[in-house]
């Protein structure tokens, strides 16, 4: 019965997202909340300048409302769901402020790095101290085994790293039409299956609400995109997926299921280190999706390829997390 409820959860979030988007997009246009495109980005992206951004609010509202209602309906509104809603709200708020400054104050970089980091730290610290001992414990497990390692206070550092790093990694992936929407749906779908296997149904409900919300948004975000989610959506999704992995004790498995996000982040790190130490670039442009664009791939080809890689990694993650 609950499995059907999870499908209903995804369906409700999808319908809310699809219903809200056509209403919200004209509103964003009216407010002139258009995306500004950086000059150093691919030249083909300049035509996207002015496309409404901050569409992540639709994802945000759809998944928050649906997960809250369905968790209450199925009596699974526990500490886990509350923590997930807290992280989603907090990181979504940071993203909203970042987007607002970009489009209203006309400051292309939004919040400063320090401002953003402080906000991310505060939410991560709150998550740890509220959830420690109640929703999660301070050990990690080796995926596919019963082996666990108690980290004590080192786990605090891991939580900070995962939430801050996860939110920024997912944010880096949001550079092509539909890329993040699709990869996020795949990753959260994989974690929902693992959550069901662990009988953590509150987490599963939340994950399926995210799946439905981002797929509904994808209808309007696929190439050519009518709207971008902005940092409002990407930071919220990044913080949420890291929190899900922590609550399911699948911290290490996140590297596999979120492999696309990891590859995007590593490409940026490698590019920066290489350029600063040798003066040469490893990639034509980073993050990685831009490299393939400059290699002559169409935007749609890059997106579908990354979706496919994300799907294969998700299947591998499910196999390790559920059946090994």
Curated annotation (Swiss-Prot):
It is a multi-pass membrane protein. PROSITE patterns: MRAY_2 (PS01348). The lineage of its organism: Bacteria, Bacillati, Bacillota, Bacilli, Bacillales. It comes from the Bacteria. Its EC number is 2.7.8.13. GO terms for biological process: cell division; cell wall organization; peptidoglycan biosynthetic process; regulation of cell shape. Belongs to the glycosyltransferase 4 family. MraY subfamily. PANTHER family: PHOSPHO-N-ACETYLMURAMOYL-PENTAPEPTIDE-TRANSFERASE (PTHR22926), PHOSPHO-N-ACETYLMURAMOYL-PENTAPEPTIDE-TRANSFERASE HOMOLOG (PTHR22926:SF5). Its cofactor is Mg(2+). It is an enzyme of class 2 (transferase). Pathway: Cell wall biogenesis; peptidoglycan biosynthesis. The chain crosses the membrane at residues 5-25, 52-72, 77-97, 122-142, 149-169, 176-196, 201-221, 227-247, 253-273, 302-322. One of its GO terms (cellular component) is plasma membrane. HAMAP family: MraY. This is Phospho-N-acetylmuramoyl-pentapeptide-transferase.
């Amino acid at each position: 019965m609950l499995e059907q409820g999870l499908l209903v959860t995804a369906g409700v979030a999808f319908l809310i997202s699809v219903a809200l988007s056509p209403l919200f997009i004209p509103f964003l246009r009216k407010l002139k909340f258009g995306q500004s495109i950086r000059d150093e980005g691919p030249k083909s992206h300049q035509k996207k300048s002015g496309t409404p951004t901050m569409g992540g609010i639709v994802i945000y509202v759809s998944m928050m409302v649906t997960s809250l209602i369905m968790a209450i309906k199925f009596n699974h509104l526990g500490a886990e769901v509350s923590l997930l809603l807290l992280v989603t709200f907090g990181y979504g708020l940071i993203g909203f402020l970042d987007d607002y400054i970009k489009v209203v104050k006309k400051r292309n970089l939004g919040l400063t790095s320090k401002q953003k980091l402080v906000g991310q730290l505060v939410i991560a610290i709150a998550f740890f101290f509220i959830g420690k001992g109640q929703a999660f414990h301070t050990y990690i497990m080796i995926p596919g085994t019963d082996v666990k390692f108690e980290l004590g206070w080192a786990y605090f550092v891991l939580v900070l790293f995962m939430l801050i790093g996860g939110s920024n990694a997912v944010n880096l992936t949001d550079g092509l039409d539909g890329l993040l929407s699709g990869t996020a749906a795949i990753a959260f779908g994989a974690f929902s299956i693992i959550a069901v296997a662990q009988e953590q149904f509150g987490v599963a409900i939340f994950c399926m609400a995210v799946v439905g919300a981002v797929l509904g948004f994808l209808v309007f975000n696929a190439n050519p995109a009518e709207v971008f989610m902005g940092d409002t959506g990407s930071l919220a999704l990044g913080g949420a997926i890291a929190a899900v992995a922590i609550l399911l004790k699948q911290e290490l498995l996140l590297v596999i299921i979120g492999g696309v996000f990891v590859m995007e982040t590593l490409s940026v790190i490698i590019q920066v280190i290489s350029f600063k130490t040798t003066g040469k670039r490893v990639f034509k442009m980073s993050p990685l999706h831009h490299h393939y664009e400059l290699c002559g791939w169409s935007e749609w080809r890059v997106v579908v390829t990354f979706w496919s890689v994300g799907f294969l990694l998700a299947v591998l993650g499910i196999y390790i997390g559920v059946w090994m």
